[in-house]
UniProtKB/Swiss-Prot annotation:
<feature type="transmembrane region" description="Helical">
    <location>
        <begin position="71"/>
        <end position="91"/>
    </location>
</feature>
<keyword id="KW-1133">Transmembrane helix</keyword>
<feature type="transmembrane region" description="Helical">
    <location>
        <begin position="235"/>
        <end position="255"/>
    </location>
</feature>
<dbReference type="InterPro" id="IPR010096">
    <property type="entry name" value="NADH-Q_OxRdtase_suN/2"/>
</dbReference>
<dbReference type="GO" id="GO:0050136">
    <property type="term" value="F:NADH:ubiquinone reductase (non-electrogenic) activity"/>
</dbReference>
<feature type="transmembrane region" description="Helical">
    <location>
        <begin position="127"/>
        <end position="147"/>
    </location>
</feature>
<dbReference type="GO" id="GO:0008137">
    <property type="term" value="F:NADH dehydrogenase (ubiquinone) activity"/>
</dbReference>
<keyword id="KW-0874">Quinone</keyword>
<feature type="transmembrane region" description="Helical">
    <location>
        <begin position="373"/>
        <end position="393"/>
    </location>
</feature>
<keyword id="KW-1003">Cell membrane</keyword>
<feature type="transmembrane region" description="Helical">
    <location>
        <begin position="8"/>
        <end position="28"/>
    </location>
</feature>
<dbReference type="Pfam" id="PF00361">
    <property type="entry name" value="Proton_antipo_M"/>
</dbReference>
<dbReference type="InterPro" id="IPR001750">
    <property type="entry name" value="ND/Mrp_TM"/>
</dbReference>
<feature type="transmembrane region" description="Helical">
    <location>
        <begin position="326"/>
        <end position="346"/>
    </location>
</feature>
<feature type="transmembrane region" description="Helical">
    <location>
        <begin position="455"/>
        <end position="475"/>
    </location>
</feature>
<feature type="transmembrane region" description="Helical">
    <location>
        <begin position="271"/>
        <end position="291"/>
    </location>
</feature>
<dbReference type="GO" id="GO:0048038">
    <property type="term" value="F:quinone binding"/>
</dbReference>
Amino acid sequence: MTITPQNLIALLPLLIVGLTVVVVMLSIAWRRNHFLNATLSVIGLNAALVSLWFVGQAGAMDVTPLMRVDGFAMLYTGLVLLASLATCTFAYPWLEGYNDNKDEFYLLVLIAALGGILLANANHLASLFLGIELISLPLFGLVGYAFRQKRSLEASIKYTILSAAASSFLLFGMALVYAQSGDLSFVALGKNLGDGMLNEPLLLAGFGMMIVGLGFKLSLVPFHLWTPDVYQGAPAPVSTFLATASKIAIFGVVMRLFLYAPVGDSEAIRVVLAIIAFASIIFGNLMALSQTNIKRLLGYSSISHLGYLLVALIALQTGEMSMEAVGVYLAGYLFSSLGAFGVVSLMSSPYRGPDADSLFSYRGLFWHRPILAAVMTVMMLSLAGIPMTLGFIGKFYVLAVGVQAHLWWLVGAVVVGSAIGLYYYLRVAVSLYLHAPEQPGRDAPSNWQYSAGGIVVLISALLVLVLGVWPQPLISIVRLAMPLM
């Protein structure tokens, strides 16, 4: 197949990020300069974001059988790039106090972003697997980047071993699907899986093993055991990337697979997914109740958020509203998580020991950093799904989709899970306004709001509030991504 100029325009974000990887590599080889390499990375990611406008002008098209570039791909590429940009921004002040090599951090984030973009455009099980590996392998290094701290190294080893096991399940599942269907393209799978073929034992086993592999990457129950330990052990900026870009890219490609190949038409697969969604919502929220570590708490809460999203995925066959619900929910989850992890990143630095992730570190934050405490409060309220925040809009969409698809027991789980979540999110918010301890442990820099990371946190808070009151611009963008499927 010949690559045309139009194809190259469609692949601009992928090409720009790939070129940035090469430039940063050469820059590191030439001269180690933290500021220079951080700047090059941020310029590359911003250029990739801007290039999405040109991709939109080119229109939807298939670029080789492995990738399809359309509105859906553009939406998820944009979300991945925003998350990667925020990660680099939060990492800069964190790395300033890091005594070992700093520059490779940006290289690993860029390679992981490349994997996320590939997943957003994936239209084939081969590109799905390649994208997942491209996003996972750099994360092994990123999670253990603060390797002189025992927790970080332990988290990296745990994530590496379990991720390798999950990848083998995913690959074996794909092999079984190929053995039965004779094709790996999403569109071809949709054509080949008609007439009750989905009930074939080999196909059910294949998709079952793929659910195990993807369930691990999305940290769904019962494949979630790595999540709290890795979130706690990883540096705060890396936890940001794990919670946002990684989850968004993988969930986006799963959505496309379910849309083209009627996987959800199988009653057995629907039941399994419904049980996983129910368990993720209830278990994730219950386990978060007892946490005194903010990163562990956010890790468990991310399990429940992916459970809410699964409700919309199960209802995908009932109408386009499910796609809209997932797009809006993921945007809300992205900005809320960026704000929450951004505050943790601003409060942390490697030369002061482990991250400021204990709930006690945030007690009375309002009395000496009022704006930072207000931002953290907004993020907690949004993650809890309180009205007037973007998190509420996303949760309302998920409930509406569940009701439309008559998934009553899952709707009940969402309501109960949200009620439980309200308790532990408010516990974090309330602790910010208690009397500060006589000897406060950690603190953000006095000029935090003028740093790039501080600006990202403030913009995230502003978007969560503005789009929570007036969500129409976001809904319009998400709807633009749908007709091009």
